[in-house]
Curated annotation (Swiss-Prot):
GO molecular function terms listed in the Swiss-Prot or TrEMBL record: ATP binding; glutaminyl-tRNA synthase (glutamine-hydrolyzing) activity
Similarity section: Belongs to the GatC family.
Organism expressing this protein natively: Branchiostoma floridae (Florida lancelet)
Reaction(s) catalysed by this chain's protein: L-glutamyl-tRNA(Gln) + L-glutamine + ATP + H2O = L-glutaminyl-tRNA(Gln) + L-glutamate + ADP + phosphate + H(+)
Job description of the protein: Allows the formation of correctly charged Gln-tRNA(Gln) through the transamidation of misacylated Glu-tRNA(Gln) in the mitochondria. The reaction takes place in the presence of glutamine and ATP through an activated gamma-phospho-Glu-tRNA(Gln).
Protein name: Glutamyl-tRNA(Gln) amidotransferase subunit C, mitochondrial
UniProt subunit comment: Subunit of the heterotrimeric GatCAB amidotransferase (AdT) complex, composed of A, B and C subunits.
Main location: mitochondrion
Amino acid sequence: MNHLHRLFRITQVDRPVLLAITRRLSSKVPTEPTWKEVDESKLPNPTKIDQDTIAHLERLALVDFANKEGIRRLEAAIRFADQMFLVDTTGVEPMDSVLEDRELYLRDDVVTEGNCKDDILRNAGKVVEDYFVAPPGNIPLPKKEEYDS
């Protein structure tokens, strides 16, 4: 970052421009989209989810798919994930991190604030013995008959 400060002094660039340059140079996000069109014929057959699986997922995730539109969205999300089957990973070593090929600029690991437990726990809907409590798993969900046909 020091080289950017020197650049600022040399060129007399105003602060917003310098910040924009800094963000662009240090960003790990590509500046241009990197996706490609997917050949749908190479994907596995679309997944259809039966009502028993829907009910099971709703109870596990506490998400109510509610109607055909909710189920369609779930199936579309699975279809999107199916694109991973098209990725050729032959000869590719598993990664430790998605950014392992980049030098990441990290701040020093120094505690800057402390004793903020109460402030953090104040954000929770429910706390037991200084732990966040997830919603209970016994939330009543609609029966199969209540779904749109």
